[in-house]
Design a protein with these regions (language model features):
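N-terminal interaction/assembly modules
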Residues: 1-101
Length: 101
């Protein structure tokens, strides 16, 4: 899989996490809707699914992991920023195959 496919998966995962935070809909419904709307030809679908599901399951742990590095209370972080932080923290904590850059 090309690195670009992972970048697209990561971007779609951030959209999915944001949608989940706003709507409170089941993560499976959000995943299904995003995959229906997206051209998956150049997307690493498995990576997208792992991130999206992983963030939904592990968000309390991820939130606690990033809190010490914030300059304001976690509750004051914008939902877009929270989605990015959660996806990033998930990759750093659980996706050991992602190289550090």
């Amino acid at each position: 899989m090309k690195p670009n496919a992972r970048r697209l998966a990561r971007s779609l995962a951030v959209q999915g996490v944001y949608s989940w935070q706003v709507s409170k809909n089941p993560i499976g419904d959000i995943e299904q809707q995003l995959l229906l709307e997206q051209n998956t030809k150049h997307l690493d679908v498995g990576y997208f699914q792992d991130i999206l599901r992983g963030v939904a399951v592990n968000h309390p742990v991820l939130d606690e992991a990033v809190k010490p590095f914030l300059d304001r209370p976690f509750e004051e972080i914008d939902l877009v920023e929270k989605a990015i932080l959660r996806v990033s923290a998930y990759e750093l904590k659980y996706r050991l195959d992602v190289p550090y850059k």
